[in-house]
């Protein structure tokens, strides 16, 4: 068991990036425990997050560093970064400004499966994305 | 915004599996909000989870279905399954028997980064894995 804890290694040595050089980061509200989103980090974005204490991810769709909130203002102040037993998933405890989700909800997990396997909204709309990101053309 | 919510689709139609046919599932304690682990599901394990209301994953290391707790007894009763805005991450709200982590902790996220970028234990040991899984040869 002691071996599995890897406590002799540094935090950055313990992180296992996948074959794309990415690691998933679960993002949780520090105070309420609500899970807000999951995003991906490469080493550069993780180092920037550790340095600035603001969540920074790797955008797989835009293929670039993504300082959370740089467009929307909805920043995440990072209090703690935890790592799982296998070293291949991170958990960020944050204070979220506004909503985390680009659709306008507080959490990206704003829909849940019903018994009949349709979906229902289970979260609060925080902003109108057209006001924040502009209208889609 | 309405388009992004995809509320006209069924839950299963909304899930986007990756190129390996897998989707990550974050697992959170239903009562306390503690994040316990992240695992991966394929369609079969997701359908089994929906059917049995017990968490079932796809083990990438063993390449087979993995009914959580089948070896350890540490089952997860599933209360709700949420899906994120992009449809590519799930969030399970569960009641966890014993510890979720094979190392013996309540959560797989039992280590956190310190200011000096070493790690410290931040969780409770629930069982001795040698008692549960046997000694490693």
From Swiss-Prot, chains A, B:
Free-text remark on how the cofactor is bound: Binds 1 Mg(2+) ion per subunit. Binds 1 zinc ion per subunit.
EC number: 3.5.4.19
Residues noted as binding Mg(2+) in the record, renumbered to the chain: 84, 86, 88
Disulfide bonds: none
Positions with a binding annotation for Zn(2+): 85, 101, 108
Pathway assigned in UniProt: Amino-acid biosynthesis; L-histidine biosynthesis; L-histidine from 5-phospho-alpha-D-ribose 1-diphosphate: step 3/9
A single MF term (Gene Ontology): phosphoribosyl-AMP cyclohydrolase activity
GO cellular component: cytoplasm
Location, primary (coarse class): cytoplasm
Subcellular location as annotated: Cytoplasm
Pfam families according to UniProt: PRA-CH
Subunit structure, interactors included: Homodimer.
Protein purpose: Catalyzes the hydrolysis of the adenine ring of phosphoribosyl-AMP.
Protein known as: Phosphoribosyl-AMP cyclohydrolase
Taxonomic source organism: Pelodictyon phaeoclathratiforme (strain DSM 5477 / BU-1)
Gene designation: hisI
């Amino acid at each position: 068991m002691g071996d599995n804890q890897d406590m002799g290694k540094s935090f950055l040595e313990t992180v296992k990036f996948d074959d794309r050089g990415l690691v998933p980061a679960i993002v949780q509200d520090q105070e309420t425990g609500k899970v807000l989103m999951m995003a991906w980090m490469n080493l550069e974005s993780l180092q920037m997050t550790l340095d600035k204490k603001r969540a920074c991810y790797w955008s797989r769709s835009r293929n670039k560093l993504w300082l959370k909130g740089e467009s929307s203002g909805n920043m995440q102040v990072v209090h703690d970064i935890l790592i799982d037993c296998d070293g291949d998933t991170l958990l960020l405890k944050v204070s979220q400004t506004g909503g985390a989700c680009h659709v306008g909800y507080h959490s990206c997990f704003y829909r849940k499966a019903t018994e009949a396997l349709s979906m229902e909204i289970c979260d609060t709309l925080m902003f109108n994305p057209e006001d924040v990101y502009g209208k889609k053309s």
